[in-house]
Amino acid sequence: MDALSSNRRQFLKFLGTAAVIGTVAPDTLAVDQAKATSLTILHTNDVHSRLDPFPMDGGRNAGKGGIARRATLIKQIRQEQKNVLLFDAGDVFQGTPYFNLYKGEPEVLAMNRLGYDAGTIGNHDFDGGIDNMVTQFGKASWPLLIANYDFKNTVMDGRTKPYRIFEKEGIRVGVFGLGIQPEGLIPKDAYKETKYLDPIEVGNDTAAKLRSEQHCDYVICLSHLGFKYDDATVSDNVLAAKTRNIDLIIGGHTHTFLDAPVAVNNPDGQPVWINQVGFAGINLGRIDLTFEQGKAISSTGKSVEVK
């Protein structure tokens, strides 16, 4: 808890510009404020087909979550904020009878209604088989981003993108996806000839392309690698420490509850912020950024309970 509190304080003071701007002359302040652009990032992970709130059974999650409440919360934030992006970090499928009966269709259609901007692939999204992924994700109104799965020899070929660029008031946000190693985790007959590519190498290459070639001001990775492990398995923490040009990792897979994003320095000593908000749609991640002249000058983040 102390570590989380420390990271929260770090995050709230990210680049500290907002704290010193009050010392600037009034005329300069007015000019700076005119240039400032705000952007709110909302995100979910590991919703696992939880369309309804948890039942009122006395459990620790009783009454929490539910797609209707999430929709209301997202709508409220969009009414309050001009520039909003909404992402998911994978494992949309599996976990309730909705998936058993309908194989993911209600989940995808619900995300369409909520206006998701993009998502990535989790291991449980293969649970109905790769043919089912084609059927269900083919109904999505949002792009499925995955840079380190090569689907060339499968029916998913051409149905995903490695990255997508979003522009909000001149701010270019590059977003890409990374998935977990399927071997040993997903049945072979579910992912078939999908090839897994090294997430560190792909992450470095994709982030560099977004930053240098696509001139993105902010780079986000939607990751289903998992937050952190006790061994050398590639996780979000490892990804942050071994890559450059990534500003924010929105994670999934390990169902990690973070009160606020945590920072891991990259090889250049720059902080990479990592966030994950548990599972089942209990929480909605929220990160508020302020940009001036194409650079993020301040940032706050939190986990918002859906209730």
Regions found by a protein language model. Name each.
Residues 2-306:
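Acidic, metal/ion-coordinating pockets
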